[in-house]
Amino acid sequence: MKTVFFHGLGQTAQDWKEVVQQLSISDVDCPELFSLTEDEISYSQILGDLEQRYSEVKEPLRICGLSLGALLAIDFAIRHEEKVDSLVLIGAQYKVPSLLIDFQNLIFRCMPNKVYESMGLSKSSTIKLAHSMRSLDFTLQLNNIRCPVTILCGKKDTANLKASKRLKELLPQATLHIVPNAGHELNKYAPNTIAEILNQ
């Protein structure tokens, strides 16, 4: 079974490196989400590219996603239940808070262009991508997810902690792990915790 990692906004596939190094499995895929497309970047474009990438898979995937990656994992599982064996959702939202996106975009606008170079996205593309996620709301479709789900959230990730707890309530088959002394980017703060769960 292939394990797939979807990184977050402001990250690259390299941010999964410490997790992957600790895995007892070798069939792993970490796509660079922002270089999948040559078109103008948007949430729906990235999702479409992922659907195409995994259109020929012969057995269900185990998908691990962080933040934006968790949204994509949820969406993919809703649309392609037969292609998903299980989900690991990190710092996840299932209904994107538009105020949070607007605040995030305000911060993005103030950041210097050189900050974006390592992300593989320009400032304007980052802002457009975040804006394209404003209306995402999977609340009514979550009951289509029947596979096992593990939810992880850093205790210091105050922006996503409440949503993670609520997501656990909406997905009765899910387990929730609050990671002490950790923030939002658990693939950086607690890669060993993610690896332990994936190695079970």
Residues covered by each model-derived region:
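Serine-hydrolase catalytic-loop signature spanning alpha/beta hydrolases and amidase-signature enzymes
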Residues: 10-18
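Active-site loop/oxyanion-hole signature of alpha/beta-hydrolase fold enzymes
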Residues: 17-21, 29-61
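Flexible "cap/lid" loop of the alpha/beta hydrolase fold
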Residues: 43, 78-79, 86-113
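Gly/Ala-rich beta-loop-alpha elbow adjacent to hydrolase catalytic centers
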Residues: 65-73
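Hydrophobic, aromatic-rich cap/lid helix
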Residues: 114-138, 156
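Short beta-strand/loop motif that positions the catalytic acidic residue
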Residues: 144-145, 151-153
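Conserved alpha/beta-hydrolase "acid-adjacent" motif
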Residues: 158-163
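Catalytic histidine-centered segment of alpha/beta-hydrolase-like enzymes
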Residues: 182-192
